């Protein structure tokens, strides 16, 4: 600094007043001060962080659950944006005539164009479903047939009609495909045969154009071309759904370093899955929902059909669809799941890239693994219950944590949405010591053997991997979650409490009292006695571990609910269906699975976490603790004295606690 001052003070020596130019300056006197000055200007001021932001979303306090809060906030934002857009369009012109023309056009579009488009769509849907409605009488004819791999029996005509309905729903478009998938889970309303057939629904939607994808990606990433953001981008979608399609790409390190708020995981995985909504899908779904609402209101006028509460069911379905049309909600669901399972080694949810995601595009960490569907298909060839339990145990525990501890349940737990990765942990199972590359290579080798039809080699390799590595259960596609509000949670725990105490009659009464329309239920006492008989049948068993199937119990209850017109809350039914799916997958892996026993560690954690709270102020907590105590007593009744001694010795049972 002193040398710089000296050079500055002596600079007059090289200046000519007559020519007003500097004389030739010695290089030493010029370069060194200039370099110092440049260094100081570069380091005297803090660098500004460069951030990237897309549309953020926060839950609205008016929502009674986390996801409902996000939904309310999303809908309000959509209305505000539409209002602001139209206001800006009207006021941007100073010409009064143009302003009035634009006001006229907006009104004309809302009151003429949109209704006409909806009517045309209604005619299209009528052409698809009206012939099917006329063919319904065929379901009364034909011999009774049993559906393969199930206990469901139906007439041949009914099975044919169900197949035709599935084809019609696929033909009708994304809204009706989603409607069919939703109806397939509602065994409390529709027959088992119909629900089984609707479970086969898949999308026949054609992938949207690559140019549309590139445009949406450029907008989200704030780049002119995607090569500026990706090292590699697979231009062929890996999945095309009824609402969106999914691509895979690797974000460049240069792009990540450019923004301070893009954070990747500790493993450095820059591969991401990108979900992009189809063009014009919102307008089509909006029209379809209006048509469904009209049809539901019409059916509700038919005598004896009020118990279905179809208008309110369509309202719930509309919320479900609109939630899936804002991909930020799915990204925020992922963030919450990651927070809930942040301490888990064997359960993983993809990390969302919230700064890059918006209403139409969602970025999340790409999970490369083996699908649960493929694992279940090879279970018989593995023929080792202990190895299969290494997969089933964390899967069941994860679901029970969602249900009991977090009250935030993944509501679409079919095998296609569960992926298995393989990691190596330390001897205590507390840390992952294998790299992301090692996990990728293991999965890649397994998938390569599947593609090459090397079944024997695949099974042998899989058994070796299961023996030497720890399975990590990964859940994807979290767009639909179930979260019970306070009222529904209390109702669910009260029912579960009655079932755990094997008070069947009380369980039946609760199902009617706390249903949506108690007045429409028929033969209420008969229904309660049926539930009591069902529970007593379970109670009379020896209660050997594995003989009590809560899934069978709930499935039969849903059948009785349907026949007695007991309308359950949709969130409640979603939890029941999730339990059925869980036990269905779990028992394929472990035939001796008992959810009552599996829930004990979670209930213990539930009790210990809340022991510092005032339990008397929380009825749901007290009910859950009663269930815990009851199940602990039930388990102790089956233990030998030696096993009890082992529990005390290992501090799993504390008599003086």
Curated annotation (Swiss-Prot):
* Any one annotated GO CC term: mitochondrial inner-outer membrane contact site
Q: Where in the cell is it found?
A: Mitochondrion
Question: Which coarse location class describes where this protein primarily resides?
Answer: mitochondrion
Which Pfam family is an annotated match for this chain, by its short name?
Answer: ABC1
UniProt keyword terms in alphabetical order: Mitochondrion, Transit peptide
Keyword Mitochondrion present in the record's keywords: the answer is yes
The answer to whether the entry has keyword Mitochondrion is yes
Q: Which GO terms describe its biological process?
A: mitochondrion organization; phospholipid homeostasis
Q: Which InterPro entries match?
A: ABC1_dom, ADCK2_dom, ADCK_kinase, Kinase-like_dom_sf
Instruction: Show the transit peptide stretch.
Output: 1-15
Q: Where is the signal peptide?
A: none
Q: Describe the family membership recorded for this protein in Swiss-Prot or TrEMBL.
A: Belongs to the protein kinase superfamily. ADCK protein kinase family.
Other facts: Present with 2470 molecules/cell in log phase SD medium.
Protein name according to UniProt:
ABC1 family protein YPL109C, mitochondrial
Q: What is the protein's species of origin?
A: Saccharomyces cerevisiae (strain ATCC 204508 / S288c) (Baker's yeast)
């Amino acid at each position: 600094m002193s040398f710089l001052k000296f050079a500055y003070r002596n600079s007059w020596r090289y200046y000519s007043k007559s020519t007003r130019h500097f004389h030739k300056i010695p290089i030493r006197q010029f370069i060194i001060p200039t370099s110092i000055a440049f260094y100081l200007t570069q380091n005297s001021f803090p660098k500004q962080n460069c951030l990237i932001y897309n549309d953020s979303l926060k839950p609205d306090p008016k929502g009674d659950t986390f996801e409902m809060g996000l939904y309310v906030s999303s809908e309000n934002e959509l209305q505000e944006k539409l209002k602001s857009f139209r206001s800006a369009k009207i006021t941007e012109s100073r010409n009064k005539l143009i302003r009035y023309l634009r006001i006229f056009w907006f009104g004309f579009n809302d009151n003429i164009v949109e209704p006409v488009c909806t009517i045309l769509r209604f005619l299209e849907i009528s052409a698809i479903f009206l012939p099917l409605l006329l063919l319904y009488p065929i379901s009364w004819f034909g011999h009774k047939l049993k559906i393969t791999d199930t206990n469901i029996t139906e007439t041949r005509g009914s099975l044919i009609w169900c197949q035709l309905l599935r084809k019609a729903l696929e033909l009708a478009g994304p809204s009706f495909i989603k409607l069919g998938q939703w109806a397939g889970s509602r065994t409390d309303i529709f027959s088992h045969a119909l629900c089984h057939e609707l479970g086969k629904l898949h999308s026949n939607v054609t992938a949207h154009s690559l140019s549309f994808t590139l445009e949406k990606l450029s907008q989200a990433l704030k780049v002119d071309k995607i090569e500026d953001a990706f090292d590699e981008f697979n231009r062929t979608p890996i999945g095309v759904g009824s609402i969106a399609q999914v691509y895979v790409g690797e974000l460049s390190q240069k792009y990540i370093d450019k923004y301070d708020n893009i954070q990747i995981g500790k493993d450095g995985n820059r591969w991401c899955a990108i979900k992009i909504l189809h063009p014009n899908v919102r307008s089509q779904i909006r029209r379809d929902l209006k048509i469904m609402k009209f049809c539901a209101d019409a059916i509700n006028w038919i005598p004896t059909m009020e118990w279905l509460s179809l208008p309110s069911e369509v309202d719930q379905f509309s919320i479900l669809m609109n939630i899936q049309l804002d991909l930020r909600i799915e990204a925020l669901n992922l963030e919450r799941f990651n927070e809930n399972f942040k301490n888990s080694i064997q359960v993983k949810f993809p990390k969302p890239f919230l700064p890059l995601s918006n209403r139409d595009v969602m970025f999340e960490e790409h999970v490369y693994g083996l699908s649960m569907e493929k694992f279940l298909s090879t279970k018989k060839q593995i023929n080792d219950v202990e190895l299969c339990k290494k997969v089933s145990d964390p899967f069941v525990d994860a679901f029970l944590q969602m249900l009991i501890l977090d009250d935030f349940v993944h509501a679409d737990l079919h095998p296609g949405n569960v992926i298995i990765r393989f990691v190596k942990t330390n001897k205590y199972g507390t840390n992952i010591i294998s790299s992301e590359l090692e996990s990728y290579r293991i999965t890649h080798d397994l998938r390569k053997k599947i593609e090459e039809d090397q079944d024997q080699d695949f099974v042998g390799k899989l058994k070796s991997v299961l023996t030497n590595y720890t399975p990590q259960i990964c859940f994807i596609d979290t767009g639909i979650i179930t979260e019970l509000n306070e009222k529904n949670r209390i109702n669910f725990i009260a029912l579960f409490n009655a079932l755990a105490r094997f008070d069947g009659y009380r369980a039946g009464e609760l199902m009617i009292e706390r249903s949506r329309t108690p007045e429409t239920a028929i033969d209420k006492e008969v229904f309660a006695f049926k539930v009591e008989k069902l529970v007593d049948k379970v109670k009379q068993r020896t209660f050997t571990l594995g003989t009590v199937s809560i899934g069978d119990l709930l499935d039969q209850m849903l059948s009785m609910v349907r026949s007695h017109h007991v309308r359950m809350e949709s969130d409640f039914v979603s939890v029941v269906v999730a339990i059925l799916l869980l036990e269905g997958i779990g028992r394929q892996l472990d035939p001796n699975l008992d959810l009552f026993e599996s829930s004990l560690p979670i209930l213990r954690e539930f009790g210990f976490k809340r022991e510092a709270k005032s339990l008397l102020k929380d009825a749901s907590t007290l009910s859950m603790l009663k269930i815990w105590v009851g199940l602990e007593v039930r388990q102790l009744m089956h233990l030998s004295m030696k096993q009890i001694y082992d529990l005390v010795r290992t501090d799993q049972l504390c008599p003086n606690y």
